[in-house]
Every structure is written in C-alpha cells, then in structure tokens.
C-alpha cells in the first residue's frame, strides 16, 4: 500500500500546512511500517495545479514500471513493499534570477524541516525500522533538494542509522561544480548518500540559455559556467564522491544496465534518448522531457538494486 501527501511551502521556506509535523510523525510510527519514503520537488515555472499534474503523472508511471519490473525474472531485489511520498509545492513562476534564490530558501528551510521531522520521528522510536529515503528533484527542484541536504550536513543533523539515503537530480539547474567542496552544496557529499544525476545535449534551457543568464547575473566575474544538467558533474565533484559511474540512456533502456554500477555517484547521459524523440520544445528543448519509461527504469535500477 502507498500513501501520498503534499507539502505546500511558501517563498520564505515556511511550510503552510500546520499539521505536517503530526502527519509525518504518525507516518513514521506504528502501525505504519513504510519501507520507502519519497520526497520530490518540481522545478521552475510550475504552479500548484501543474505541480499536482506532474506529480500524479510521475508517480503513476513510475509505479507502473515498478509493477512490470516486479513481474520479470530476475527482478530487482529491493522493490518497495510499502511507500510514503511527499510532494513539495513551492511558488516557482517568477524570473530565472528570482527562482534560483527562492529554490535555495525553500530547500534550506522548508524541505530541511521536513527531513528533520522524519529523522526525529524515527529516532523517537524504540526500534526504528529500516527505511530508504529517496529524494528527487527536477530543474530548480534539484536546488531545493541539495540546499536541504546541505543544511542537514552543515548543522550536524544525525541521519538515523536505519535510514539509507538516495538522491536523483534530473536535469539540475545549477552550476556543474556546486557539489565541489567549495560549492554551494559542497557539504552534501559528506552525508552517507548515493547520487544519480542526469544530463543531456538536448537540454536547450541548460545548454544554451543557462550560461547566458548566469553571465548576466555575475557580469564581472569573468567565469564561464555550465549547468550540471548540461555538462554533468565536474571532475572535482567526481573525485569527492570517490569516482563516478557513467551510463548512456537510449531507446529501450532497462534497469539491468544500471544495477552493476556500485559507485556513490552515477552520471547518466539522456542525450541518446532525447535525440531519438525529436527536436523538443523551441526554447527549452528536452529540459522537461523526463516522462519516459527508460528514465523510470533508470531510477528504479538506481533506487532498488
């Protein structure tokens, strides 16, 4: 059985549902015994209605792939027996310049608080169950996720020993070196987590427009930047994670291809898949082209191997 809630967070990172703490405490306590918890953040230019539609589509299509995988042989050994999902809703329909900062605020305060509530509820139990916590972000939602992890790491919050932490960043809209030790999210790698990042040559938003916008914001820095979702993780980031596994995702990709990769950091190239699906949108290309069976198979193989 699966359960799903939404967590509305305003532009100041304040959770607008006053009951969210008690809901999460109940969810982490008996008689519930969830094996997997998902926290997902949407990206830029998504209103509340659009966010719900995105979450509904993503969760249903991922669930469909998990059921199909469960019926295959050999199957993935750690498919979720019972899951609980939290969908983060935050106001993201402003300019590029405003949204980057807002995403960090939402993560640093709102999603950080959600994670603290989950950890504290588990730690209060006499015998906390084993739990896999899966964080997913798309576009600026990756900033939401990473700023929350950065804050968890910096303030010394103890992730309960029974919690296994996995993170997926789909077409992340931040600089490719922000996970370096001196980057905005440089402390996140110190947590005991596994990380899957995707990139694509077909992502026009990140490959073409993101560097221009960053240069305008930092006019006098003289620094050339690339987005993580366009260039992939920097060499320094890969070293910080102890190396990176690399995989290309094309038409017909299935989960067995990612299962053998044991590195903490996996870099997945979606370029072959996007190239096979046409030119994409005029402005954004394939930036939001994440609703494919092959991508769900990639995520499943990473999370549940």
Language-model-detected regions and their locations in the chain:
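Surface-exposed alpha-helical segments enriched in charged/polar residues
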Residues: 25, 29, 60-63, 116, ...
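Gly/Ala-rich beta-loop-alpha elbow adjacent to hydrolase catalytic centers
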Residues: 136-141, 145
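Short hydrophobic segments within beta-strands
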Residues: 40-41, 136, 198
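Lipolytic serine-hydrolase domain surface
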Residues: 1-18, 44-45, 53-56, 78-80, ...
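Short, surface-exposed "cap/lid" segments of acyl-processing enzymes
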Residues: 29-94
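Long, contiguous juxta-domain segments that are non-catalytic but functionally important
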Residues: 1-32, 49, 67, 71-75
